[in-house]
Amino acid sequence: MKKTQLLSLLFVLLFTFIGAQTTTFLSEKTNQPLPKVSVFGKDGTIIAYSDIDGKIERNTLNPSQEKFQLVYENFSLGTFSYAELNKDVVKLNDRVKDIEAVVIKNNKPAKYVLIKGNFNAYVTVNGKLNCYVDGVATYVFDNKTKKVKSTNVEQYRIYYLETAKNDLKQMGSWDYSSSLEFPKLRDVGNIGEFKSKKLKIKELKGNAKDEVEITGQALQQKEVAFFGYRLYDIKSILNISYEKDSKKTLRDFIESNEIYFMKLKHKTEPQYNQVISYRNFYPTELDFSDKNDVEKVKFDKDISQYKTNYWQDASFPNMQTIFSSFFKEDLKEKENKK
Protein backbone atom coordinates (compact mmCIF):
# COMPACT_ATOMS: atom_id res chain seq x y z
CA MET A 1 0.00 0.00 0.00
CA LYS A 2 1.33 3.41 -0.95
CA LYS A 3 2.23 5.85 1.80
CA THR A 4 -0.42 8.35 0.64
CA GLN A 5 -3.10 5.65 0.72
CA LEU A 6 -2.01 4.58 4.19
CA LEU A 7 -2.15 8.16 5.45
CA SER A 8 -5.59 8.64 3.92
CA LEU A 9 -6.83 5.49 5.64
CA LEU A 10 -5.41 6.62 8.97
CA PHE A 11 -7.10 10.01 8.68
CA VAL A 12 -10.44 8.37 7.84
CA LEU A 13 -10.15 6.08 10.85
CA LEU A 14 -9.11 8.99 13.07
CA PHE A 15 -12.02 11.21 12.08
CA THR A 16 -14.45 8.31 12.31
CA PHE A 17 -13.29 7.65 15.86
CA ILE A 18 -13.48 11.31 16.84
CA GLY A 19 -16.92 11.72 15.28
CA ALA A 20 -18.23 8.63 17.02
CA GLN A 21 -17.26 9.71 20.54
CA THR A 22 -20.24 9.75 22.85
CA THR A 23 -21.13 10.51 26.44
CA THR A 24 -23.48 8.05 28.13
CA PHE A 25 -25.78 9.18 30.94
CA LEU A 26 -26.41 6.51 33.57
CA SER A 27 -28.61 6.49 36.64
CA GLU A 28 -26.56 6.91 39.78
CA LYS A 29 -28.93 4.55 41.60
CA THR A 30 -29.64 1.81 39.05
CA ASN A 31 -26.62 2.14 36.73
CA GLN A 32 -29.03 1.96 33.76
CA PRO A 33 -29.07 4.31 30.72
CA LEU A 34 -31.03 7.56 31.01
CA PRO A 35 -32.85 8.43 27.77
CA LYS A 36 -34.46 11.82 27.15
CA VAL A 37 -31.95 13.92 29.06
CA SER A 38 -31.89 17.43 27.57
CA VAL A 39 -28.59 19.31 27.63
CA PHE A 40 -29.04 23.09 27.73
CA GLY A 41 -26.29 25.56 26.93
CA LYS A 42 -25.84 28.66 29.05
CA ASP A 43 -27.89 30.69 26.54
CA GLY A 44 -30.90 28.35 26.77
CA THR A 45 -30.29 26.42 23.55
CA ILE A 46 -30.94 22.68 23.63
CA ILE A 47 -27.71 21.28 22.28
CA ALA A 48 -28.24 17.55 22.88
CA TYR A 49 -30.91 15.01 23.82
CA SER A 50 -29.94 11.52 24.92
CA ASP A 51 -31.23 8.49 22.99
CA ILE A 52 -32.67 5.30 24.46
CA ASP A 53 -29.13 4.13 25.29
CA GLY A 54 -28.53 7.33 27.25
CA LYS A 55 -26.01 8.58 24.68
CA ILE A 56 -25.30 12.02 23.24
CA GLU A 57 -22.69 12.94 20.64
CA ARG A 58 -19.66 14.38 22.43
CA ASN A 59 -19.00 16.90 19.66
CA THR A 60 -22.23 18.75 20.54
CA LEU A 61 -20.55 19.94 23.75
CA ASN A 62 -18.66 23.16 23.10
CA PRO A 63 -16.03 24.02 25.75
CA SER A 64 -16.82 27.72 25.29
CA GLN A 65 -20.24 27.12 26.86
CA GLU A 66 -18.48 26.48 30.20
CA LYS A 67 -21.70 25.48 31.99
CA PHE A 68 -24.51 23.16 30.93
CA GLN A 69 -27.87 22.49 32.56
CA LEU A 70 -29.27 18.95 32.37
CA VAL A 71 -33.03 18.42 32.42
CA TYR A 72 -34.67 15.03 32.94
CA GLU A 73 -38.41 14.31 33.29
CA ASN A 74 -39.08 18.08 33.14
CA PHE A 75 -36.86 18.78 36.16
CA SER A 76 -33.39 20.28 36.32
CA LEU A 77 -30.67 17.89 37.47
CA GLY A 78 -28.31 20.79 38.04
CA THR A 79 -25.49 22.63 36.31
CA PHE A 80 -22.43 20.79 34.99
CA SER A 81 -19.08 21.97 33.66
CA TYR A 82 -17.64 20.91 30.33
CA ALA A 83 -15.05 18.77 32.14
CA GLU A 84 -17.82 16.94 34.04
CA LEU A 85 -19.61 16.01 30.80
CA ASN A 86 -16.58 15.39 28.57
CA LYS A 87 -16.40 11.75 29.65
CA ASP A 88 -17.44 8.35 28.35
CA VAL A 89 -19.89 7.86 31.23
CA VAL A 90 -21.62 10.43 33.44
CA LYS A 91 -23.72 9.20 36.37
CA LEU A 92 -26.72 11.35 37.31
CA ASN A 93 -28.98 11.51 40.34
CA ASP A 94 -32.17 11.00 38.35
CA ARG A 95 -34.70 10.09 41.02
CA VAL A 96 -36.36 13.48 41.01
CA LYS A 97 -39.90 12.15 41.30
CA ASP A 98 -41.61 8.79 41.36
CA ILE A 99 -43.71 7.66 38.40
CA GLU A 100 -47.30 8.74 39.02
CA ALA A 101 -49.78 5.85 38.96
CA VAL A 102 -52.50 6.15 36.31
CA VAL A 103 -55.92 6.11 38.01
CA ILE A 104 -58.23 3.52 36.41
CA LYS A 105 -61.76 4.84 36.96
CA ASN A 106 -63.75 1.99 35.42
CA ASN A 107 -62.83 -1.58 34.51
CA LYS A 108 -65.98 -2.52 32.59
CA PRO A 109 -65.48 -3.23 28.85
CA ALA A 110 -66.88 -0.45 26.68
CA LYS A 111 -66.72 1.03 23.19
CA TYR A 112 -64.12 3.67 24.02
CA VAL A 113 -61.03 4.06 26.14
CA LEU A 114 -60.59 7.60 27.49
CA ILE A 115 -57.09 8.58 28.61
CA LYS A 116 -56.77 11.93 30.36
CA GLY A 117 -53.42 13.48 31.12
CA ASN A 118 -51.01 16.39 31.06
CA PHE A 119 -49.06 17.50 28.00
CA ASN A 120 -46.41 19.95 26.93
CA ALA A 121 -45.06 20.75 23.48
CA TYR A 122 -42.49 23.20 22.18
CA VAL A 123 -40.58 24.13 19.04
CA THR A 124 -36.91 25.06 18.88
CA VAL A 125 -35.15 26.75 15.96
CA ASN A 126 -31.40 26.19 15.75
CA GLY A 127 -31.58 24.89 19.31
CA LYS A 128 -33.33 27.96 20.76
CA LEU A 129 -36.89 27.91 22.09
CA ASN A 130 -39.39 29.52 19.72
CA CYS A 131 -42.77 28.73 21.31
CA TYR A 132 -44.30 26.56 24.03
CA VAL A 133 -47.68 25.13 25.08
CA ASP A 134 -48.85 22.96 27.96
CA GLY A 135 -52.19 21.85 29.32
CA VAL A 136 -54.64 19.06 30.08
CA ALA A 137 -56.18 16.86 27.38
CA THR A 138 -58.20 13.67 26.94
CA TYR A 139 -57.59 11.19 24.13
CA VAL A 140 -60.47 8.99 23.01
CA PHE A 141 -59.43 5.57 21.67
CA ASP A 142 -61.54 2.98 19.89
CA ASN A 143 -61.39 0.04 22.30
CA LYS A 144 -61.50 -2.45 19.43
CA THR A 145 -58.82 -1.03 17.13
CA LYS A 146 -56.90 0.88 19.86
CA LYS A 147 -56.66 3.83 17.45
CA VAL A 148 -57.09 7.47 18.48
CA LYS A 149 -60.58 8.71 17.59
CA SER A 150 -60.23 12.26 18.90
CA THR A 151 -57.97 14.57 20.87
CA ASN A 152 -59.71 16.94 23.26
CA VAL A 153 -57.87 19.76 25.02
CA GLU A 154 -59.57 20.95 28.21
CA GLN A 155 -57.32 23.89 29.08
CA TYR A 156 -53.95 25.18 27.95
CA ARG A 157 -51.54 28.10 27.92
CA ILE A 158 -49.24 29.23 25.10
CA TYR A 159 -45.96 31.13 25.32
CA TYR A 160 -43.92 32.80 22.60
CA LEU A 161 -40.66 34.74 22.35
CA GLU A 162 -41.00 38.45 21.67
CA THR A 163 -37.95 38.25 19.42
CA ALA A 164 -39.79 35.97 16.96
CA LYS A 165 -40.81 37.66 13.69
CA ASN A 166 -43.18 37.04 10.81
CA ASP A 167 -40.85 37.67 7.89
CA LEU A 168 -41.63 34.92 5.36
CA LYS A 169 -38.05 35.00 4.10
CA GLN A 170 -36.45 34.51 7.53
CA MET A 171 -37.20 30.98 8.73
CA GLY A 172 -34.53 31.32 11.42
CA SER A 173 -36.55 33.97 13.27
CA TRP A 174 -40.06 32.98 12.20
CA ASP A 175 -42.79 32.59 14.87
CA TYR A 176 -43.69 28.87 14.78
CA SER A 177 -46.61 29.11 17.26
CA SER A 178 -49.03 28.03 14.54
CA SER A 179 -47.14 24.73 14.22
CA LEU A 180 -47.58 23.74 17.89
CA GLU A 181 -49.33 20.37 17.98
CA PHE A 182 -50.41 17.76 20.51
CA PRO A 183 -48.68 14.40 20.80
CA LYS A 184 -50.21 12.06 18.21
CA LEU A 185 -50.11 8.91 20.40
CA ARG A 186 -50.14 6.89 17.19
CA ASP A 187 -50.30 3.14 17.90
CA VAL A 188 -49.43 3.44 21.60
CA GLY A 189 -52.04 0.71 22.08
CA ASN A 190 -50.67 -1.31 19.15
CA ILE A 191 -46.92 -1.10 19.58
CA GLY A 192 -46.55 -4.13 17.32
CA GLU A 193 -47.82 -2.04 14.38
CA PHE A 194 -44.48 -0.24 14.23
CA LYS A 195 -42.64 -3.51 13.63
CA SER A 196 -44.39 -3.98 10.28
CA LYS A 197 -42.98 -0.69 8.97
CA LYS A 198 -39.50 0.30 7.84
CA LEU A 199 -38.55 1.83 11.16
CA LYS A 200 -35.69 1.39 13.59
CA ILE A 201 -36.94 0.04 16.92
CA LYS A 202 -35.02 -0.33 20.19
CA GLU A 203 -36.24 -1.36 23.62
CA LEU A 204 -34.97 -0.61 27.11
CA LYS A 205 -36.13 -2.53 30.16
CA GLY A 206 -35.63 -0.30 33.18
CA ASN A 207 -36.18 -0.86 36.88
CA ALA A 208 -39.44 1.10 36.89
CA LYS A 209 -40.72 0.97 33.30
CA ASP A 210 -40.19 -0.46 29.82
CA GLU A 211 -39.37 1.99 27.02
CA VAL A 212 -39.63 1.59 23.26
CA GLU A 213 -37.87 3.98 20.84
CA ILE A 214 -39.04 4.14 17.21
CA THR A 215 -36.99 6.13 14.70
CA GLY A 216 -37.92 7.05 11.12
CA GLN A 217 -36.39 9.37 8.54
CA ALA A 218 -36.89 10.80 5.05
CA LEU A 219 -35.27 13.22 2.57
CA GLN A 220 -31.79 12.34 3.77
CA GLN A 221 -30.13 12.64 0.36
CA LYS A 222 -32.10 15.38 -1.37
CA GLU A 223 -34.17 18.45 -0.61
CA VAL A 224 -37.74 19.27 -1.56
CA ALA A 225 -38.53 22.71 -2.99
CA PHE A 226 -41.94 24.39 -2.71
CA PHE A 227 -43.05 28.04 -3.08
CA GLY A 228 -39.51 29.31 -2.57
CA TYR A 229 -38.77 27.13 0.46
CA ARG A 230 -36.39 24.21 0.86
CA LEU A 231 -37.06 21.22 3.11
CA TYR A 232 -34.47 18.59 3.98
CA ASP A 233 -33.42 15.90 6.47
CA ILE A 234 -36.71 14.89 8.11
CA LYS A 235 -36.52 12.58 11.12
CA SER A 236 -38.81 11.43 13.93
CA ILE A 237 -38.08 9.77 17.27
CA LEU A 238 -40.92 8.34 19.34
CA ASN A 239 -40.29 7.09 22.86
CA ILE A 240 -43.22 5.28 24.49
CA SER A 241 -43.14 4.01 28.08
CA TYR A 242 -45.19 1.22 29.67
CA GLU A 243 -45.47 -0.49 33.02
CA LYS A 244 -42.51 -2.76 33.67
CA ASP A 245 -42.81 -6.27 32.19
CA SER A 246 -46.32 -5.49 30.91
CA LYS A 247 -48.11 -6.48 27.69
CA LYS A 248 -47.77 -2.85 26.49
CA THR A 249 -51.49 -2.18 26.10
CA LEU A 250 -53.35 1.10 26.63
CA ARG A 251 -53.86 0.05 30.24
CA ASP A 252 -50.07 -0.18 30.65
CA PHE A 253 -49.27 3.12 28.89
CA ILE A 254 -47.54 5.68 31.15
CA GLU A 255 -45.73 8.22 28.93
CA SER A 256 -45.17 9.35 25.34
CA ASN A 257 -42.37 11.56 24.01
CA GLU A 258 -42.28 12.55 20.33
CA ILE A 259 -39.58 14.55 18.56
CA TYR A 260 -39.77 15.70 14.93
CA PHE A 261 -36.75 17.15 13.13
CA MET A 262 -36.50 19.01 9.84
CA LYS A 263 -34.16 21.43 8.15
CA LEU A 264 -35.89 24.38 6.53
CA LYS A 265 -34.94 27.60 4.78
CA HIS A 266 -36.17 30.20 2.34
CA LYS A 267 -34.27 30.13 -0.95
CA THR A 268 -32.68 33.48 -0.06
CA GLU A 269 -31.23 32.18 3.23
CA PRO A 270 -27.64 30.89 3.01
CA GLN A 271 -28.01 28.11 5.59
CA TYR A 272 -30.66 25.61 6.63
CA ASN A 273 -32.42 26.16 9.96
CA GLN A 274 -32.80 23.15 12.25
CA VAL A 275 -36.43 23.08 13.42
CA ILE A 276 -37.31 20.56 16.15
CA SER A 277 -40.78 19.91 17.56
CA TYR A 278 -41.09 18.20 20.97
CA ARG A 279 -44.45 16.74 22.07
CA ASN A 280 -44.94 14.98 25.42
CA PHE A 281 -47.94 13.36 27.14
CA TYR A 282 -48.28 11.94 30.66
CA PRO A 283 -51.49 9.97 31.42
CA THR A 284 -53.22 10.52 34.77
CA GLU A 285 -56.59 8.78 34.33
CA LEU A 286 -57.95 5.90 32.25
CA ASP A 287 -61.67 5.27 31.80
CA PHE A 288 -63.88 2.96 29.73
CA SER A 289 -67.08 4.42 28.31
CA ASP A 290 -69.68 3.93 25.59
CA LYS A 291 -69.79 7.71 25.16
CA ASN A 292 -67.02 9.77 23.63
CA ASP A 293 -68.25 13.21 24.67
CA VAL A 294 -65.63 14.87 26.85
CA GLU A 295 -64.99 18.40 28.05
CA LYS A 296 -63.01 20.41 25.51
CA VAL A 297 -62.25 23.86 24.14
CA LYS A 298 -61.19 24.94 20.67
CA PHE A 299 -57.40 24.90 20.41
CA ASP A 300 -56.85 28.49 19.28
CA LYS A 301 -53.10 29.07 19.03
CA ASP A 302 -53.50 32.84 19.33
CA ILE A 303 -54.70 32.67 22.96
CA SER A 304 -54.45 30.69 26.20
CA GLN A 305 -57.55 29.10 27.75
CA TYR A 306 -57.63 27.87 31.34
CA LYS A 307 -59.83 28.13 34.43
CA THR A 308 -57.46 26.64 37.00
CA ASN A 309 -53.73 26.87 37.67
CA TYR A 310 -53.24 23.25 36.60
CA TRP A 311 -49.47 23.74 36.19
CA GLN A 312 -49.08 24.22 39.95
CA ASP A 313 -49.78 20.54 40.59
CA ALA A 314 -46.54 18.91 41.76
CA SER A 315 -46.85 16.15 39.13
CA PHE A 316 -47.38 18.52 36.18
CA PRO A 317 -44.61 18.51 33.50
CA ASN A 318 -43.92 22.24 33.73
CA MET A 319 -41.10 22.95 31.27
CA GLN A 320 -42.14 26.61 31.24
CA THR A 321 -40.18 27.19 34.46
CA ILE A 322 -37.04 25.78 32.81
CA PHE A 323 -37.39 27.99 29.74
CA SER A 324 -38.27 31.07 31.81
CA SER A 325 -35.04 30.68 33.77
CA PHE A 326 -33.18 31.35 30.50
CA PHE A 327 -35.42 33.77 28.61
CA LYS A 328 -36.90 35.76 31.52
CA GLU A 329 -39.30 38.50 30.37
CA ASP A 330 -38.76 37.67 26.68
CA LEU A 331 -40.98 34.60 27.09
CA LYS A 332 -44.53 35.94 26.98
CA GLU A 333 -47.82 34.16 27.64
CA LYS A 334 -50.65 34.71 25.20
CA GLU A 335 -53.73 36.27 26.80
CA ASN A 336 -56.00 33.90 28.72
CA LYS A 337 -59.53 33.93 27.24
CA LYS A 338 -61.17 31.59 29.74
Regions found by a protein language model. Name each.
Residues 88-338:
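Surface-exposed, low-complexity/disordered segments
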Residues 45-55:
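Short, acidic Ser/Thr/Gly-rich low-complexity loop/linker segments typical of extracellular
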Residues 37-41, 68-69, 104:
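Hydrophobic beta-strand segments
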Residues 29-43:
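Short, ordered, surface-exposed loop/turn motifs in non-cytosolic proteins
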